[in-house]
Curated annotation (Swiss-Prot):
The lineage of its organism: Eukaryota, Fungi, Dikarya, Ascomycota, Saccharomycotina. Disulfide bonds: none annotated. InterPro entries: AAA+_ATPase, ABC1_TM_dom, ABC1_TM_sf, ABC_transporter-like_ATP-bd, ABC_transporter-like_CS, ABC_transporter_sub-D, FA_transporter, P-loop_NTPase. Residues 608-866 form the ABC transporter domain. One of its GO terms (biological process) is ATP transport. GO terms for molecular function: ABC-type transporter activity; ATP binding; ATP hydrolysis activity; ATPase-coupled transmembrane transporter activity; long-chain fatty acid transmembrane transporter activity. Involved in the import of activated long-chain fatty acids from the cytosol to the peroxisomal matrix. This is Peroxisomal long-chain fatty acid import protein 2. It comes from Saccharomyces cerevisiae (strain ATCC 204508 / S288c) (Baker's yeast).
Length: 870
């Protein structure tokens, strides 16, 4: 019993003696309530007093800093935990109790909201609904957890920013030609431009995160310096056998571990958070140009650098390369900032111990080894870029196989695809192995220099002050020498570690250079294509030669703005119809107007009833009465035009010009089109958005949020499906409505059903003008007849592109493109002698083919007999 009572008394006596001998504070009669205030007041008094013993004052300062950091850590943790508890209690009160004994709420479908300023608010689910299996009856039931949604504010797009940044990217290469190569760094100039995207202003959140990271880096360096001193003091007390001092230092060790651990975790968290924020800024910047109304994502294929791996595998560039660039940027910053801060702090402290000569010798060693490593550093940036390009090729080929799996299966192309995939995989493995092989020799040299050479020299520099002091005084104090050696050794190791990480960062910078160049190339191309003066990849040298020849013939000076000379056609928007006048249909290429010409001087217009003309005509009829409200097309006359011709003659190219995704090269060419809301295009290949509902497919390109915001209802879509004979789709699913069903509609629907969905889109959007390209080639004859009559019944103005003469009966005008691919064409009204003659010629051609059927069958029989003999 006495032993049990003696233990607390001994512990109390030990604590009282620690306060008395270590910091000179007597706490015998102090109550716990006033203990903390008394301790802080006493420590502040000692740390400020010049009369106090230096050792006592140093201990007081260490305790104050440790208590402050521990208090900050504890306060932040308690505050965050309290906030979370209050938030949980509020949600528990607001939702479960309020909704008890009520019917379950309808699932929220709205994902974003457009503000008047152009900004958007998006709601992103954080926790997905999962299915849980009941342990009692093996029945699946939906989880009761509701989806947590995070509110994200997306600022409106500022086109002025992109117009300004376009010149920044353009001037980088121009500055390289102006400046001397000695003072020019391609990497630094590219990073300088990209940094304006990553951190737009000093008031940006990323700048605050960067400042916080620098603060914690400095804090970690100071803590490392303090731990080094404390380590030497602990070793000294152990050798001297001072038990009380050892216990006191050990308590300080455990106390300082709290802010040190918090600092290390905070640095990692801030680095990851900063990388994600950089990725958000860069991705939004890319998306604003890539997914713009100027159709940058399509026009990229015509840029001069379209064959570059960055643009050819642009999906890999936007996803993987951006992520790698942001991670590498934050990693390199941390790997450079921390060693630099360490070098400054440790050098200042070591200067007092080693002297100026010792610190100078350390830095001379750093510069020599840095020069050696820099000289033998392999081109890791170039190799990283090549590896990323090979990775993109391999990924895209697999993606192409997924998108065309059915076609490959029909062709039995497994062997060919396997060979190609194996070849791309071997190339990828070769690139990855090449990087590892190149790193092998460099890593061996790096380890020898940084780990062993620097450690050996560290022992030499750490022992210099001890040896010199012993020789000078003739006194050998083992305790003092041991403490100084431990402190100097630990600081030297930390300094060597800082230097080695600084040398390691040379390799990281080399890899970052490759990622930076790829991202900069991507943004440069996007800016060029996004520009209003994009010339579709026309090469200036070809244009200048052509311009000089033309100027020489006309005795004029050549113009210098070649980009403006490439595309010289005129586009008139918000026109009450579709008009093409004297337009040369030319495939976009580096030769611009000197490229492959498909159709010469194409001229037509709907919905005006014009006289039959041919390609020999210079212009269409006078449009001075275009504003007359009595004209048929202003009242929805249902004018129609059929563009007829063989494969490869340029029919679909006409649609591309009307949609403004192909340019008008010739100077006297005029394109007049209605506003975007009054024209609708149906391409050859029906498109279905991935992961969307049936409602999303019908209303495309309108979003579901806009659909409900504008007051539309599902019953209108049901009526449209009835009109296009697709109402049976609604009976496939079970539940409230099949319109909410999510499926891979591209594979679920047949070819004819997908084309009828296109007509459903026309019925929903109700445009004044529709351009259809082979929109019924997968539909039966009776359904085709019904759909075209549906367009005529609702008085749509439409242009059909086809190679089947059977569609002539549904149109008023016929534009026939020659079969000889000489660029000739003929426009005529259906029912005229020319149109009837054209139809008769088609019928005669079909009859001649039918007469040869018997001969073809005989040839097939003979071939089968020969094959049986073989």
């Amino acid at each position: 019993m006495s032993t049990t009572l003696a233990a607390p008394a001994k512990l109390k006596s030990l604590l009282l003696n620690l306060h008395t001998h270590c910091i000179g504070l007597h706490v015998n009669d102090v109550t716990p309530k006033v203990y903390f205030k008394l301790l802080i007041r006493h420590l502040l008094q000692i740390s400020r007093s010049n009369a106090a013993h230096p050792k006592l004052r140093r201990r007081a300062q260490i305790l104050l800093v440790s208590l402050f950091l521990s208090g900050v850590t504890l306060f932040s943790g308690v505050t965050y935990s309290t906030f979370k508890i209050i938030l949980k209690c509020y949600k528990f009160y607001k939702f479960p109790w309020k909704r008890r004994n009520r019917r379950p709420l309808i699932r929220r479908t709205r994902s974003q909201m457009q503000l008047d300023s152009g900004a958007r608010i998006m709601y992103i689910p954080e926790v997905e609904l999962v299915d849980r299996q009941s342990p009692d009856d093996n029945k699946f039931m939906n989880a009761t957890d509701k989806k947590k949604r995070k509110r994200i504010f997306i600022p409106p797009k500022d086109n002025d920013v992109y117009e300004h940044d376009k010149f920044l990217f353009k001037n980088v290469e121009l500055e390289r030609a102006k400046n001397s190569q000695l003072f020019y760094s391609k990497f630094l100039n590219q990073m300088n431009v990209l940094s304006k995207i990553l951190i737009p202003t000093v008031f940006d959140k990323n700048f605050l995160l960067l400042t916080a990271q620098i603060f914690f880096l400095v804090m970690r360096t100071w803590l490392s310096l303090f731990v080094a001193k404390l380590d030497g003091q602990i070793v000294k007390n152990i050798i001297a056998g001072r038990g009380r001092s050892f216990l006191w230092d050990l308590g300080c060790w455990f106390l300082i571990a709290v802010p040190a651990s918090y600092t290390n975790s905070a640095i990692k968290l801030l680095q990851r958070k900063l990388s994600l924020n950089f990725r958000v800024n860069l991705t939004r910047y890319i998306h604003d140009m890539y997914l713009d109304k100027r159709l940058t994502f399509y026009k990229l294929i015509f840029d001069a650098k379209a064959s570059n791996s960055v643009i050819k595998n642009i999906d890999n560039s936007i996803t993987n390369d951006v992520a790698k660039f942001c991670d590498a940027t934050c990693s390199v910053f941390a790997n450079i900032a921390k060693p630099v801060i360490d070098l400054i702090f440790f050098s200042v402290y070591l200067r007092d111990n080693l002297g100026t000569v010792g610190v100078a010798g350390i830095f001379v060693n750093y510069f020599i080894t840095g020069f050696i490593l820099r000289k033998y550093t392999p081109p890791l940036g170039k190799l990283a870029g090549e590896r990323s390009a090979s990775d993109g090729d391999y990924y895209n080929y697999h993606l192409n196989m997924i998108n065309n799996s059915e076609e490959i299966a029909f062709y039995q192309g497994t062997a060919v695809e396997r060979t190609k995939v194996k070849e791309l995989y071997d190339v990828l493995m070769e690139k990855m192995l090449l990087v590892d092989k190149v790193k092998f020799g460099y890593n061996m040299l790096e380890d020898y220099v940084l780990k062993y050479t620097w450690s050996g020299l560290g022992y030499v520099f750490a022992s210099i002050p001890i040896v010199m002091s012993t020789l000078a005084t003739g006194i050998n104090s083992e305790e003092k020498n041991m403490k100084e050696f431990i402190v100097n050794k630990r600081l030297m190791l930390s300094l060597a570690d800082a230097g080695s990480r600084l040398m390691h960062s040379i390799k990281d910078i080399s890899q970052l250079t490759g990622y930076t160049n790829r991202i900069f190339t991507l943004l440069s191309v996007l800016h060029r294509v996004h520009s209003l003066n994009f010339n579709y990849g026309a090469v200036p040298s070809i244009l200048s030669i052509r311009t000089e020849d033309a100027s020489r013939n006309s005795n004029l000076l050549p113009t210098t703005d070649n980009s403006q000379d490439a595309i010289r056609g005129t586009i008139q928007r918000n026109f009450n119809g579709i008009r093409l006048e004297n337009i040369d249909v030319i495939i976009p290429s580096v030769r611009a107007s000197e490229g492959i010409k498909l159709i010469n001087k194409l001229t037509f217009q709907i919905p005006l009833h014009i006289d039959p003309i041919t390609s020999k005509s210079n212009s269409i009829q006078d449009l001075s009465k275009a504003n007359d409200i009595k004209l048929p097309f202003l009242q929805g006359s249902g004018s129609s035009l059929l563009i007829l011709g063989p494969n490869g003659c340029g029919k679909s190219s006409i649609q591309r010009i009307i949609a403004e995704i192909w340019p008008v090269y010739n100077k006297n060419g005029l394109l007049s089109i209605p506003s975007e809301n009054n024209i609708f295009f149906i391409p050859q290949k029906p498109y279905f958005s991935r992961g969307g509902t049936l409602r999303d497919q019908i209303i495309y390109p309108m979003s579901s949020d806009e659909f409900f915001d504008r007051g539309f209802r599902d019953k209108e879509l049901v009526q449209i499906l009835v009109e296009v004979k697709l109402d049976y789709l609604l009976k496939r699913g079970v539940g409230l409505t099949y319109l909410d069903a999510i499926a891979d509609w591209k594979d679920l629907l047949s070819g004819g059903e997908k084309q009828r969905v296109n007509f459903a889109r026309i019925m929903f959007h109700k445009p004044l003008y529709v351009v259809l390209d082979e929109a019924t080639n997968a539909i039966s004859v009776d359904m085709e007849d019904y759909l075209f009559n549906l367009l005529k019944r609702y008085r749509f103005n439409f242009i059909s592109i086809s190679q089947r003469p059977t569609l002539i009966k549904y149109h008023e005008m016929l534009l026939e493109i020659g079969e000889n691919r000489d660029g000739k064409w003929q426009l005529q009204a259906v029912g005229t002698d020319e149109a009837i003659t054209s139809i008769d010629n088609e019928i005669e051609e079909l009859e001649r083919k039918l007469e040869r059927v018997k001969g073809w069958e005989d040839e097939r029989t003979k071939l089968r007999e020969k094959l049986e003999i073989i």
